Amino acid sequence: MVSSPAYDIAAALKQEGLKPSDWDEICRRLGREPNRAELGMFGVMWSEHCCYRNSRPLLSGFPTEGPRILVGPGENAGVVDLGGGHRLAFKIESHNHPSAVEPFQGAATGVGGILRDIFTMGARPIALLNALRFGPLEDPANVGLMEGVVAGIAHYGNCVGVPTVGGEVAFDPSYSGNPLVNAMALGLMETEEIVKSGAIGVGNPVVYVGSTTGRDGMGGASFASAELSADSLDDRPAVQVGDPFLEKGLIEACLEAFASGDVVAAQDMGAAGLTCSCSEMAAKGGLGVELDLDRVPARETGMTAYEFLLSESQERMLFVVKAGREDALMQRFRRWGLQAALVGKVLQEPIVRVLHHGAVAAEVPATALADDTPIEKHALLQEPPADLQALWGWTEQELPVLSDAAAALLQLLDDPTIASKQWVHRQYDQQVLANTVVSSGAADAAVVRLRPQQGNGSMAASNRGVAATVDCPNRWVALDPERGAQAAVAEAARNLSCVGAEPLAVTDNLNFPSPETPKGFWQLAMACRGISDACRTLNTPVTGGNVSLYNETKQDDGTMQPIHPTPVIGMVGGVDDISRVTCLAWQQPGDAIFLIGVPPEDGADPSLGLAGSAYQQQTLGSLAGRPPKPDLAIEAAVGSLVREAIAQGLLASAHDCSDGGLAVALAESCIASDLGISVTLSTGSARLERVLFAEGGSRVIVSVNAASFPAWEQLIGSNPALCVTQLGSVTLEARLVIRSESAVQLDLEVERCAAVFRDALPRRMHSE
């Protein structure tokens, strides 16, 4: 008999984020009313954060299979075959709401959580990336949020000993009070068998390892599935507290345990803690789990069953272990200074049964919590929202005529979204483990060397590497979520191609406002459609990811301020030879500069434009128009050409055109090398601002030295469908000179550009 003390049902439903209809469904499934602990279990497991009740039908449209995909959606992380015996686990997740109320710990535990997803699969973490969004830094509150978030990421990653090698940071008023903190991790498989999470073997013991359980992080999953308001500051107990040094030991102990073969299933305790780990293990295995809370190592006294089940204390894992091997396994963890306790067993009956003080504290069908969960039905708008349709009527002719190209470029280089992120990157240890080939700022994607992992002699030493990037043009997504999401996938693939990596697979983090408004759900649905289309065309299946909804903040007048929809794309690619990796800096004077993709003078190509561009926002102070429509077939062809040129050793540099367009990309390569350029652009009938600052067009800038010129011409001659335009050359004199047919349009010292570019963030952060 399940104990069931009386409680205020209406108040409890509100606390758990459940609806009256959810109560009715829970009662139907149980055949009785749930007790308070059981209601808490349903509250976290039926939240958007855990069960994707608003987004699951949309996610089902993603391509998830491919010849390199070893593990797709449904496990703790995706796994791809990199070749040469190397298998890579990777995933991205958000910690947005916790970071809004407690930026340091919210961001730090986001890093800890994504690392656990990786090593739970049997993979050793080798790299971290992140995608961050903040409000304007003119607001001291946003400065404080950014300082805390970056410090938290740096603290956890640096202490645990995993390099933070890449990422992106962008700013917009829509993120004020609701920052986005998305963390991505990569890991190399160390075990012959990939460790799965489904419970196996009736009677097998269930073992808890890691840290103790306390009251921190209570209800974190439900908290992450609600809007933010001024009262959210009172929810600091819903933010977990991490210990990276303990996690470092946990990584080593877990990898040892997995290598022993004693562990048959593993699940980390992240969102929803013990409730999620037990129910997911049971549901995925088609079995049940019995859990005795009296055996769970606790750091506080007097904890209730509800508190044990919903605690999100960090650095904890749950294992199903081969019968008879539990004592040896627990001794292994204790040698690492970690807690280890036998807390339950696998049941034949597919239920989650929880014992506390010798009585049954909860008993729930496993699938009711982790498989057969509710799906919200939303009507999809048949036409785009009226406000967007009105904005789409804007044309480039409404922009004022560009009068000072040099001043416009300097303003763009001072834009915190475009400017150097060295203020951020210098806080991260990018070189720990000594495998980082290229990190943030030096190239369009990070590259990490693949070395034989400890205790795994089956992987021969090689010159292979893995490249990774995170991308999202949130201005484009705000105006057209389908085109913007396509552009996010396209830019990620282009960034990988620019270092010579073959794009392989995607992990996505969908950061969106409430789906309960017609516009909110339409934005989410259109972005999912865009991701699906782009991933199919570019042959990059989705292996999993994260959905973070209700990213909006209640204003003083009671209205909700939604963020720009931000579908962040994390993408990984294989590098056959790290000695060929290409960076964005010019290499030597005299090298010829080429533009691959839509030429600058093309004033009509729909894949290139100023709508949604950094230049438009800088000039008008707002966004308008419909962003360019990505040509995914051209995108694939451009990427293929760039990768082939790098493989043949023909390119001295490669850099994609994204925020700020052609002029900003050229300036960035000058700043990175302290070399100049002499470039002549044909303007044709196009306006100068379009030639210099338009975005889109599947464009990559490359430089080629004289010795490689014949082979380069032969290669581009074999790709006649692609437009390749020679722009000019690299110069020893560090000046950025851009001419049109009629005159010098822009002439700036590279040193002046660099000073603006590098000082933009420190100046706003009030630091050196």
Curated annotation (Swiss-Prot):
Binding-site residues for substrate, renumbered to this chain: 94-97, 116, 240, 312-314, 548
Catalysed reactions listed for this entry: N(2)-formyl-N(1)-(5-phospho-beta-D-ribosyl)glycinamide + L-glutamine + ATP + H2O = 2-formamido-N(1)-(5-O-phospho-beta-D-ribosyl)acetamidine + L-glutamate + ADP + phosphate + H(+)
Enzyme class: ligase
Major site of localization recorded for this protein: cytoplasm
Domain of life (superkingdom): Bacteria
Keywords attached to this entry: ATP-binding, Cytoplasm, Ligase, Magnesium, Metal-binding, Nucleotide-binding, Purine biosynthesis
InterPro entries: PRibForGlyAmidine_synth_PurL, PurL_linker, PurM-like_C_dom, PurM-like_C_sf, PurM-like_N, PurM-like_N_sf
Residues involved in Mg(2+) 1 binding: 93, 546
Binding site for Mg(2+) 2: 117, 268
E.C. code: 6.3.5.3
Entry similarity comment: Belongs to the FGAMS family.
Assembly notes: Monomer. Part of the FGAM synthase complex composed of 1 PurL, 1 PurQ and 2 PurS subunits.
Functional note: Part of the phosphoribosylformylglycinamidine synthase complex involved in the purines biosynthetic pathway. Catalyzes the ATP-dependent conversion of formylglycinamide ribonucleotide (FGAR) and glutamine to yield formylglycinamidine ribonucleotide (FGAM) and glutamate. The FGAM synthase complex is composed of three subunits. PurQ produces an ammonia molecule by converting glutamine to glutamate. PurL transfers the ammonia molecule to FGAR to form FGAM in an ATP-dependent manner.
Designated name of the protein: Phosphoribosylformylglycinamidine synthase subunit PurL
Organism of origin: Synechococcus sp. (strain CC9605)
Lineage: Bacteria, Bacillati, Cyanobacteriota, Cyanophyceae, Synechococcales
